[in-house]
Amino acid sequence: MVKHLQDHIQFLEQFINNVNALTAKMLKDLQNEYEISLEQSNVLGMLNKEPLTISEITQRQGVNKAAVSRRIKKLIDAKLVKLDKPNLNIDQRLKFITLTDKGRAYLKERNAIMTDIAQDITNDLNSEDIENVRQVLEVINHRIKTYSNHK
């Protein structure tokens, strides 16, 4: 059982590395056009669903606050994000990073590239197989979040 689990872990590690390498390669031209790094692109992706604080981004990226602050400053300078203060009922020291129209435009282009890649890679798989993989990944993702919140 342990050996079998180790094989799965090694496979997942290689899979994640392959996905990251492909993503970096396919997004390189777009990132160059917007003059941002892969890490800055990842921050924009995090902000796609909701505004976040620097602390929240730091936690999700697993790097130090200074590195995230530098990324955010560059994104602000590039007019891809802006700082927003919350309403008066919330701690005024909190500043939320939100996407600008230019940041949303970048993500729209990025998502189009990623959709094309996903379609090319999965075009010979039936929708049931894809849905089954997604369901398993959602269970694993939920467990990762639960595990992470308890450690």
From Swiss-Prot:
Top-level taxon of the source organism: Bacteria
Keywords: DNA-binding, Repressor, Transcription, Transcription regulation
Regions recorded as binding DNA: 54-77
Stretches assigned to the HTH marR-type domain: 1-142
Name the UniProt record assigns to this protein: HTH-type transcriptional regulator TcaR
Knocked-out gene: effects: Cells display a 5-fold increase of the ica transcription but has no significant effect on the adherence ability nor on the amount of poly-N-acetylglucosamine polysaccharide (PNAG) produced with respect to the wild-type strain. Double deletion of icaR and tcaR increases ica transcription about 500-fold, and poly-N-acetylglucosamine polysaccharide (PNAG) synthesis about 100-fold. Adherence is significantly greater than that of the single icaR mutant.
Function: Involved in the antibiotic teicoplanin susceptibility. Inactivation of the tcaRAB operon leads to teicoplanin resistance.
MF (Gene Ontology): DNA binding; DNA-binding transcription factor activity
SUPFAM superfamilies: Winged helix' DNA-binding domain (SSF46785)
Transcription among keywords: yes
InterPro entries linked to this entry: ArsR-like_HTH, HTH_MarR-typ, MarR/SlyA-like, WH-like_DNA-bd_sf, WH_DNA-bd_sf
Family annotation (CDD domains): HTH_ARSR
